[in-house]
């Protein structure tokens, strides 16, 4: 039986999907902008 593919790590999670990571690229800022416009409670992880 193979292992589960999801091995949670809060460090990896923040580093790849965190707010600062989003703001560091133009595409990331676009994501945050869209989520704001849509009224999301959480903009990023």
Swiss-Prot record:
Domain of life of the native organism: Bacteria
Keyword annotations: Ribonucleoprotein, Ribosomal protein
Similarity field: Belongs to the bacterial ribosomal protein bL34 family.
InterPro entries per UniProt: Ribosomal_bL34
Molecular function via GO: structural constituent of ribosome
Record-level GO BP terms: translation
PANTHER family on file: LARGE RIBOSOMAL SUBUNIT PROTEIN BL34M, MITOCHONDRIAL RIBOSOMAL PROTEIN 34 FAMILY MEMBER
Keyword Ribonucleoprotein: yes
Source organism: Syntrophobacter fumaroxidans (strain DSM 10017 / MPOB)
Compositional bias ranges of the Basic and acidic residues kind: 18-31
The name this protein goes by in its record: Large ribosomal subunit protein bL34
């Amino acid at each position: 039986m193979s292992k589960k593919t999801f091995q949670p790590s809060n460090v990896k999670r923040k580093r790849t999907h965190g707010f600062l990571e989003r703001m560091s690229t133009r595409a990331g800022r676009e994501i945050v902008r869209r989520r704001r416009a849509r009224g999301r409670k959480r903009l990023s992880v």
